[in-house]
Amino acid sequence: MELISSLFLCFTISLSLLTFPIQSRSSGFSINLIHRDSPLSPYYNSSMSYYEILRNSIRRSMTRSSHMFTPKLASSPPTIQSPLTAVTGEYLMKISVGTPPLDFLAAADTGSDLTWIQCKPCIECYQQNTPIFDPKRSSTYRNQPCQSKVCQKPLSCGDKNFCNYAFTYGDGSYTEGDISLESFTFETTSGKPVVVPNISFGCGHKAGGNFDKFTDGIVGLGNSDLSIINQLRNTINGKFSYCMVPSKSNVPSKISFGSNAIVSGYGVQRTPFFTRDQQLYYYLFLESVTIGEANIKFVTETYSNNANDKDGNIIIDSGTTLTYLPSEFYQLVEDEFKRSISSTPVEGEDELTLCYKNEEGFEKEVPTITFHFTGGNLELSVLNTMLEIEDGKLCFAMAPGGTAIFGNVQQTSCLVGYDLEAKTVSFKKTDCTKY
């Protein structure tokens, strides 16, 4: 509990001595990312076994992937339809909002654009552990007028000529409020907080659904003008990266920005990312998957594997645990994987249909799997392909799904960098516990 409580400590020394504003394009900083199942997280339940925690993560992954493209009818007031499920953000990030700063723990996610927290007056809010933000107590808070550049459709103009938002998630959860400007403070791994003024964010006066008391809001890392990444674009040279530690590690993962986010050196693989109209996601172009010596081209009813396609064919997502492949392609991958292993499969678990007993020597049988993206290849180790779902039982960490998603298990122990200027994603195998 002491570790959890430390996340919410307020600074008692003068901010002028402890913080520095980001001003130049060469600025760089890193922030801890806390997995929601880590002992550092308020979600952590010491009475649950590792296997119970892992199963819950897989269920959240399944829910999230199923809601990614759930269509919603327009409602009144107009809503921005978010494709992610509100309750399934896997990583938490500490942010401090306002002057003086108030600390919050929000879900950091590449599948969301709007950064928001709950605000007073709270017309209809869910319970949260931290105090709700009061704009009247901050000297740097400003409402965005309807004439501001950010206030464009699907945002709307509300009372008092202020810009409003109404945001509905795939699972029916929602948040509504004002689009405002405020100073954000980030506690960096160097120990010196960084202050970023004039961040556009959602000051929510209504929120409900499946949100819970441990998550105070969302930090949007998606690919849209509203996301905090694009707002910092010039300041951070359009670069951010993350390095996710294995699930059993007690060391936090990290997200880096600017010069700290440059991925370079031996072994770096780069591939272009693509965007789609009114979509938040980063799409990659998957050409094929190799299992051992067998190469399987990524051809499905939806994607023809045409190199001239301009919108990619697989989402890279930090908030989805598993990798999902279209059913017909997944079956080809699973069949080849089974052919490569002499052991006999055992009964599956939940949506993990391919499982084996973890007998002596089994892990040496597991074939190397390589994802071949345009311009770059990512080789997966046993850590990235098999999950120990119970003592002595390993399951294949991929599943069939309607939408192709490259999940965070496959990104574990890898430095993943995004360059918004070059429109590339870089991969470098890394010991993220030491990064």
Language model segments and positions:
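Disordered propeptide/prodomain
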Residues: 2-106, 114-178, 198, 230-231, ...
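Glycine-rich flap/beta-hairpin and adjacent strands of clan AA aspartyl proteases
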Residues: 168-281, 371, 377-431
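Beta-strand-rich binding-surface signature
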Residues: 90-94, 103-107, 114, 164-166, ...
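Beta-strand elements of modular eukaryotic interaction domains
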Residues: 81-85, 93-96, 104-106, 173-175, ...
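Extended C-terminal subregions enriched in glycine
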Residues: 345-378
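Charged, amphipathic alpha-helical segments
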Residues: 161-169, 223-228, 239, 347-359
